[in-house]
UniProtKB/Swiss-Prot annotation:
Keyword Nuclease assigned: no
Protein name: Conotoxin ar3c
Predominant cellular place of this UniProt entry's protein: secreted
Disulfide bonding pattern of the chain: C2-C14, C3-C12, C8-C15
Tissue and organ expression note: Expressed by the venom duct.
Entry domain remark: The cysteine framework is III (CC-C-C-CC).
Record-level Gene Ontology MF annotations: toxin activity
Protein's cellular compartments: Secreted
Naturally occurring in which organism (per UniProt): Conus araneosus
Length: 17
């Protein structure tokens, strides 16, 4: 799951720039 914020979170394994 990617964060809509575009930052890396502990909940999200996917990081989008």
């Amino acid at each position: 799951v990617c964060c809509p914020f575009g930052r890396c979170h502990q909940i999200c394994q996917c990081c989008e720039r």
